[in-house]
C-alpha cells in the first residue's frame, strides 16, 4: 500500500537532516504502522491569523476526517490512523499552536479553546474543506467541543475519544496552575514523566517499553505550548449542557483502563448525546489510538462507513 501523506522533508530554519516534530512522531510509531510517504507539497503549513500551523494530509475522499491530538503530544501520535483511515478518505492531522511544527508564541492570549477552534477553521479554509468529521482525543476533544460550538455547520460527524464535556474541577484547575509554574521555573522534563504515567495503562507501561519511549518523544514540545494549553484547558467552558443539542452522528470512545477520562465519564457523555454510540477498547489507557490502534481504527472505520 502506497500512501500519499503530505509532509515536509525539511522544516524551514532547521539544520538539514533535522526532522520536524511530526516526522519524529511518525518515525517513532512501531514499524508495523510506519508510513510509506510520498510527498505532495514541499512545506505542509498554513499561515492563519499571523501564525504558522503545521499539518499532515493524507488520502483523497471527502468528507475529510480531522484528527485533533492530545496534550501534551503532537500530530505524530496519529500515525496509525493516518495510515489506516486514509485508504478510504482524506485525513488531516494538524499540530495545535505550540506543538510539533506549528508556531509556539509566548503570548498567552493566543491559547484558548476558542482560539484553537478558530485556527482550525482557518486551516480548513486554507485546504478548501467546508464540512469535516472531527475526531478529538483528550484535549483534542475539548477543541472539538469548541469548534462544534462556534462552527456547527462545518461538522458532519463527531468522534470523542478519551475526553469529557465537564469543565475542570477546582482541584484540576489548581493542579494545572502548579504545572504551569513548574514549567516556567524548570522546564517540561520533570512534568513530562508525571504526565506520562497517566497517559498509558499500567499494562502498556509494564509490557510495551517501546511505546512508552515513543510516547515520551511525542511529548517533546515547546514550553510555551505546554503552558498555553494548560491555560486553555483550565479555563475551558463546561460543555455538559450542550450535549443534548449535538445533532450530528457521534461516536464516544474510551480505553477500558483509562484513569484520566474513565469509562464512566464516557458513558455519561453517551447518555447526554442523542443517538451516540460507544466503543470501549480493552486493555487500553488514555492514548487508546496508540495502545490499541487496530481496535481504534476498526471502530472509527465502522462508524464512518455508516454515515
Sequence positions of predicted segments:
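Short beta-strand/loop motif that positions the catalytic acidic residue
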Residues: 246, 252-254, 258
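Active-site loop/oxyanion-hole signature of alpha/beta-hydrolase fold enzymes
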Residues: 48-56, 79-83, 92-135, 151, ...
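Active-site glycine-rich loops that stabilize anionic/oxyanionic intermediates
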Residues: 70-73, 138
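Catalytic histidine-centered segment of alpha/beta-hydrolase-like enzymes
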Residues: 284-297
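Conserved alpha/beta-hydrolase catalytic His-Asp/Glu region
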Residues: 168-174, 185-245
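Flexible "cap/lid" loop of the alpha/beta hydrolase fold
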Residues: 142-193
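Catalytic histidine neighborhood in serine/cysteine hydrolases
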Residues: 263, 267-286
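Alpha/beta-hydrolase fold catalytic core
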Residues: 1-6, 10-12, 18-66, 86-89, ...
